[in-house]
Structure formats: structure tokens, C-alpha cells
């Protein structure tokens, strides 16, 4: 410790601060700087030529002797990657010739498939209708034969055969509706019973004609 540090703060020099060592540097003044105060007759300084004395504390001296290393990852946040936050701008690619050709080919294939399906459905349903008509004719012939056989057993003639024939037609249609696989395995629809009934009616028109003619003669 120096003598200046052992003394009290009273009477200490102006550049003395407790706990701080000072570096004494000479202060040079210009004669023009000194001016006399007319009231107090004390010279005052307006401008200092030399710099202000530099004071250094013990802590700053220790810090300068042992510089600290600052790691970016310890206390300082990492800089944000701007590329992550920025939205990706997707460039719209114009369709190439290959893509256009592929779309055209797909549309053509879809049209071909639709045409084939309509053709197959038309042939299938058309074939079903033709088969229904043929089946109706065969069933009409069978109904006529069965009606004549029943009428011959009971000795019925003329208009008496009509109710028997009508009952047989209803029974045949009912059987086809309940289990169409027994009588007609190829049937896949149930909306062509009218097509079946018309051939039966036409085939069995002989008994219907007799019935309506006798009914007309009665009235």
C-alpha cells in the first residue's frame, strides 16, 4: 500500500479514490488557458491540453490479466435460420407434352370402357327380353295344354276353361317371382314379368277369345 492509500480521504489529492490505483500523468497547461477570476482572484482553467488521468481499478486489472472467453452457444441465442421461416414458393410447372398425351389417352380409355359397358348391358338386357318372350310363349302353350287337360277331367267346356287358365297363369308368374333360378336361371332382373305375361296371354288367346265371344253373346 502507498502512503496515499494509508491516509484518510480528507486532505487526499483530487485524483485519489479509495480502492483505485491511479496512474499519475503530468498535466500541461497553456498560459492562455489560465484566466483570473476578477471576483475571487483565483485562476480558472478553461481548456486542458493533456487528457484526463486514466484510473484503473483492481477488478479491471484482474479482468485484463485474465480475459474471459464468451461462447455463443452458452448464453447467446443462436441466430435463426431465415430459410426455415420463409415460406417455400413452389413454382407451378406447365404441363408438358407427355402429360397432355397421357391425359388424352386416359380420357379415350375411359370413353372406350363406357361404350363397352353400355354395349354389354344392352346385349345382356336385350337377350333377357328375347328369352323372356320365348319363355312366355312356351309357358302359354303349357298353360293351354294343362287347362284343356283339367277341363277334360271335370267335363268343363267353353267359358269354364277361362278361370282355370287364369289361375294357372297367376301361379306360374308367382313361382317365377319367388324363385326365378328354378324356372329361369339366366334371369337377373324382376321387371320383365309383363314381358312374360304378354306371350302367355297371346298364346292362351284361344280360350280368352272363346270366353269374350260367349260373354258378348250373353249380353
Curated annotation (Swiss-Prot):
Subcellular location: Membrane
GO CC term (a single one): membrane
Chain positions covered by the region annotation Disordered: 70-102
Keyword terms of this UniProt record: Coiled coil, Membrane, Transmembrane, Transmembrane helix
Coiled-coil segments: 96-120
Transmembrane segments: 126-146, 153-173, 192-212
Presence of the UniProt keyword Membrane in the record: yes
Primary localization: membrane
Composition bias type Basic and acidic residues, residue spans: 73-101
Membrane topology, record value: Multi-pass membrane protein
Name of this protein: Uncharacterized protein L631
Source lineage: Viruses, Varidnaviria, Bamfordvirae, Nucleocytoviricota, Megaviricetes
Amino acid at each position: 500500500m502507498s502512503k496515499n492509500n494509508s491516509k484518510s480521504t480528507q486532505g487526499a489529492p483530487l485524483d485519489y479514490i479509495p480502492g483505485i490505483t491511479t496512474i499519475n500523468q503530468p498535466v500541461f497547461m497553456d498560459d492562455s488557458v489560465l484566466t483570473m477570476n476578477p471576483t475571487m482572484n483565483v485562476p480558472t482553467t478553461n481548456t486542458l491540453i493533456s487528457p484526463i488521468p486514466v484510473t484503473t481499478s483492481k477488478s479491471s486489472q484482474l479482468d485484463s490479466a485474465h480475459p474471459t472467453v464468451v461462447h455463443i452457444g452458452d448464453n447467446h441465442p443462436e441466430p435463426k435460420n431465415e430459410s426455415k421461416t420463409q415460406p417455400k414458393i413452389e413454382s407451378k410447372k406447365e404441363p408438358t407434352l407427355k402429360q397432355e398425351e397421357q391425359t388424352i389417352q386416359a380420357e379415350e380409355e375411359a370413353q372406350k370402357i363406357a361404350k363397352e359397358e353400355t354395349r354389354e348391358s344392352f346385349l345382356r338386357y336385350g337377350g333377357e327380353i328375347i328369352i323372356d318372350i320365348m319363355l312366355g310363349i312356351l309357358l302359354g302353350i303349357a298353360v293351354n295344354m294343362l287347362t284343356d287337360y283339367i277341363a277334360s277331367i271335370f267335363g268343363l267346356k267353353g267359358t269354364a276353361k277361362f278361370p282355370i287358365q287364369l289361375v294357372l297363369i297367376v301361379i306360374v308368374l308367382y313361382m317365377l317371382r319367388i324363385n326365378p333360378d328354378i324356372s329361369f336361371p339366366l334371369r337377373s332382373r324382376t321387371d320383365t314379368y309383363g314381358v312374360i305375361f304378354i306371350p302367355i296371354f297371346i298364346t292362351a288367346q284361344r280360350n280368352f277369345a272363346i270366353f269374350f265371344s260367349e260373354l258378348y253373346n250373353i249380353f
